[in-house]
Amino acid sequence: MAATSGGCILTADLPDPALDVPANYKAAAGAPDKALPSLDWWRGFRSQELTVLMEEAQTVNLDIAAAVARIRQADALAQTAGAALLPNVTGTFSGSRSRSSSNTGVISAGSSIGRGEVTNHVASMSASYEIDFWGKNRDALLAAEETANANRFDRDVVALTTLASVANAWFNVVASQERINIATRNIASAQRIYDAIKARVDAGTGSELDLAQQESVLANQKASVPPLRQALAQNANILATLVARPPERVRLTGGSLGSIAIPRVTPGLPSDLLTQRPDIRRQE
């Protein structure tokens, strides 16, 4: 009995540790915001395209789908582990038919004779139950259930990581488009200056040195565009991977950084925010 009681203590839920934390601090900058951030935080940027990508990633992302499959697998294993705590019932039924050379014979239980044919029916049922004296089966069930719960927190971690990756890739796309537009305007401006200097050189009032310097500036401006286009394509491909679509089917309008709303970030986030982190909840 002592060993059995010890096993029960190991599977009991541990109480939350009581910490002597002051309610207020001397260096507090003011009353903190008690409201927790919204779970759909991306809506604060007021971008319809970003919202669509976020919602699509939550339903079709392959990493999230794999995490959900692991949850289903863990639930099935937990059900299998729980079956050991239930009685085991088995039943059998068999029948046979034979033909005899005569119509005479003995009729016994489970058999019948008719016109030289003998039919036998045999049915049996048995039940067994394993007494979980040391708590092995129940501990196995609890371990399987905790594994399933841990997989649910892992799924939340994957979802948060995926959503953060979608947001970062989309903002990189918008930033790359903005930089390409700026570089295009710089090229046009450098081209106009180059044409003006060349016109003065042709008229004999300009310097060949000024023309060569401006030609170098124009070449540098043009050379800055291909890396920006490559970065734009790479981030667009990242978005396509995150939403499980071919890159050719991803059409991004992007826009400009100036058109994106900046959510208000309040100082003094509540410490309860840490309890929403799935990695911390998994360890607990």
Predicted regions and their residues:
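Terminal intrinsically disordered/low-complexity segments used for targeting and assembly
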Residues: M1-T59, V106, E145, R229-T275
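Small/polar-residue-enriched beta-strand and adjacent coil segments characteristic
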Residues: L10, D40, R46-L53, V68, ...
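Charged, alpha-helical scaffolding/interaction elements associated with membrane systems
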Residues: V60-N61, A203
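Acidic, glycine-rich calcium-binding repeat modules characteristic of RTX/beta-roll
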Residues: L77
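Periplasmic alpha-helical coiled-coil/stalk elements that build and connect Gram-negative outer-membrane
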Residues: R155-L269
